[in-house]
């Protein structure tokens, strides 16, 4: 009898151990899992956020410190700088005041010789009382309120140039279609170049450019028509870099043109016009005008 009871007790103990081992392999019940995680976790509310509600942390912003910091590029329009040799600054100071007031009404963007512009002006003889012209800027001249710029385009095989006054009240909009520079400060030689270098679609769409991006320089060199030209562009006094002289002139003609060179002017320090102090004073006037 005792042996039977002992055998039954051993069998029950073995069955209990096997059941406990199998139980550890099974996943825990939901009640146990909830009992374990119920303490530290807060229930998320579906309604409006409360002051003590949980908010996810913001996404980290990764900055590349190896990349150099881009400084803000400032552009001072050339007509603000008075010509050299003028001793009475009052006239130019009064003109700059009027120019800054005009710029509050009309946005005059940054552009250079070689940029493609679209200008809208008031025209009493046009059907819509306005007219538009698109072309490449071939020259900027004048100082103060008398600043001008020339746009050129070839329309139906005919070269058309219009000289606009920058601060003319009839100018309603100046749009930069393509901002770029050229190798030269004046592109008047396009009058003697092939028409393809002055032909632009009047329906061109403006190109988007980042504000702090450097202005690209177009290193295009044009091909000229056969002589005669309007001026002797090959002579050193023009200092032209954007013409393929090797395609239109012989070596003898180039040597003849070099006779007009004046290499000593490069070392003449009196010809340099230092405008750093003038530009600093003009920038102060511009900042004061923006605050007013």
Swiss-Prot record:
GO terms for cellular component: mitochondrial large ribosomal subunit; nucleus. Residues 40-61 are annotated as: Disordered. The modification Phosphoserine is found at residue 77. GO terms for biological process: translation. It is found in: Mitochondrion. The keyword Ribosomal protein applies. Gene3D superfamilies: 2.30.30.790. InterPro entries: Ribosomal_bL19, Ribosomal_bL19_sf, Translation_prot_SH3-like_sf. Belongs to the bacterial ribosomal protein bL19 family. Component of the mitochondrial ribosome large subunit (39S) which comprises a 16S rRNA and about 50 distinct proteins. This is Large ribosomal subunit protein bL19m.
């Amino acid at each position: 009898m005792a042996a039977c009871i002992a055998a039954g007790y051993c069998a029950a103990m073995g069955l209990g151990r096997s059941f406990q081992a199998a139980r550890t392999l099974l996943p825990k019940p939901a009640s146990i899992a909830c009992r374990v995680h119920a303490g530290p976790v807060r229930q998320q509310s579906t309604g409006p956020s409360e002051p003590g509600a949980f908010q996810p942390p913001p996404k980290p912003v990764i900055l590349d410190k190896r990349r150099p910091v881009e400084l803000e590029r400032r552009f001072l329009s050339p007509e603000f700088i008075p010509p050299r040799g003028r001793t009475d600054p009052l006239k130019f100071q009064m003109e700059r005041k009027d120019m800054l007031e005009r710029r509050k009404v009309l946005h005059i963007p940054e552009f250079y010789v070689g940029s493609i512009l679209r200008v809208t002006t008031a025209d009493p003889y046009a059907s819509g009382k306005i007219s538009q012209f698109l072309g490449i800027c071939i020259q900027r001249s004048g100082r103060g309120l008398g600043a001008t710029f020339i746009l050129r385009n070839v329309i139906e095989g005919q070269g058309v140039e219009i000289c606009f006054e920058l601060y003319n009240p009839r100018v309603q909009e100046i749009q930069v279609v393509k901002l770029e520079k050229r190798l030269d400060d004046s592109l008047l030689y396009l009058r003697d170049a092939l028409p393809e270098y002055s032909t632009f679609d009047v329906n061109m769409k403006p190109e988007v450019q980042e504000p702090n991006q450097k202005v690209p320089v177009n290193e295009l060199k044009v091909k000229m028509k056969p002589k005669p030209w309007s001026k002797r562009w090959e002579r050193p006094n023009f200092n032209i870099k954007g013409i393929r002289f090797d395609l239109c002139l012989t070596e003898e003609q180039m040597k003849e043109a070099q006779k007009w060179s004046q290499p000593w002017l490069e070392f003449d320090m009196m010809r340099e016009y230092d405008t750093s102090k003038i530009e600093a004073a003009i920038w102060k006037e511009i900042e004061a005008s923006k605050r007013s």
